[in-house]
């Protein structure tokens, strides 16, 4: 590397420019050719960048209010999002989950430096019920038992419509109780949601839309008595035996396929079984299945809210299946799940096919 404008003089022959300031340029050889860098401009740009950086992190209005409430200088943060209607249901369960030991002492929404009321929405639940949830806003929670146990919960919606919950607890403060572990709070919330939340025992589809059980569906079916008795025994009666089978370490899962031409009432029979089931029922239409991962997710969800009747409509057309393709990977995934090769404790898959 050589400074531009410097002559090739001998060391004992001083240059006329010897007393001038050194050139601020230096050149760099690259495969694309030579280019020059003005070190003065580079230094000025670097200084300007440093000048723009804050010398210290300043607390905004929210931080100041939060730290004052928590009586802490630092917080431990946990955050998670859930897609679409699942996120709204998770927020609905949050109130139920916290109610035994915590109460809201203040809630607000800050927009452009101004405190405003939180934004709420009302969502449908099973049984034509509805529940109000906080969509956007912040809540300050305080223990009903130990008042110094406090935390902040922020409810928000991401740009793509996913619902998010963010938790702040005082760093280094042990607030764990027999019910709540604040170092693992959101995982515990999810676990309780699937165990005792609004999906448990409900009838819904893969997009978490609730389906009402029709009490008059018996009047809409013309039954073959033997088919009715077999289905009642293999599905409805079996449901009641599932807890005991699990207790004894025996298989409490089985699969059923309803086959017949279109219009013979297969879907109606599946809904009849759901109407008479006391367990969670999930209805999955063929267009909701596009790949093996979708199948796995269906069974993962069914296991989480088990015992579950998992109804899969038109299994032969799911994921653009050809019913003649016996070695199709999607069909193989279904069959493995149904015959117990993949453990699905507490899940009864019921598939319909043409």
Annotate the PLM regions:
Residues 218, 222-354:
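Walker A/P-loop NTP-binding motif of AAA+ ATPase domains
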